[in-house]
Amino acid sequence: MHTYIYIYTVYIQMVAFSPYRIVLPFVAFVDLASFSSFRSYQAFLRPFLRPFRHQTCSSYFALDLDFASAFVVPAASFVESLLAYQAYSAYQACLAYPACLACQAS
């Protein structure tokens, strides 16, 4: 059974300053085992990615999740947490670029 709680934990940290900061802590308790694949999980998360205005950063994070999707479904929970951390790290690295900083400042 895969609950993706680790990925939710990382995601909650990412949107800590967004309008979703009130909703996501409750969503984190939802059992996501009913999702048949990581694709459906991605589709579920897609609306929550909207607060990220910089297209490059959002695309980079989505691409990293897409790459990880081939491994998350059959993986054990500790592997899921590693993949989630990798995706979050990649997103943070993208935010460090001047273009992202300029976009956030606007």
Swiss-Prot record:
Any one GO CC term of this protein is: membrane
Q: What is its main location?
A: membrane
Supply the name of the protein.
Putative uncharacterized protein VPS69
Phenotype on disruption: Causes a vacuolar protein sorting defect.
From its record, what is one biological process in GO terms?
protein targeting to vacuole
Alphabetic keyword roster: Membrane, Transmembrane, Transmembrane helix
Stated membrane topology is: Multi-pass membrane protein
Species per Swiss-Prot/TrEMBL record: Saccharomyces cerevisiae (strain ATCC 204508 / S288c) (Baker's yeast)
- Lineage of the organism: Eukaryota, Fungi, Dikarya, Ascomycota, Saccharomycotina
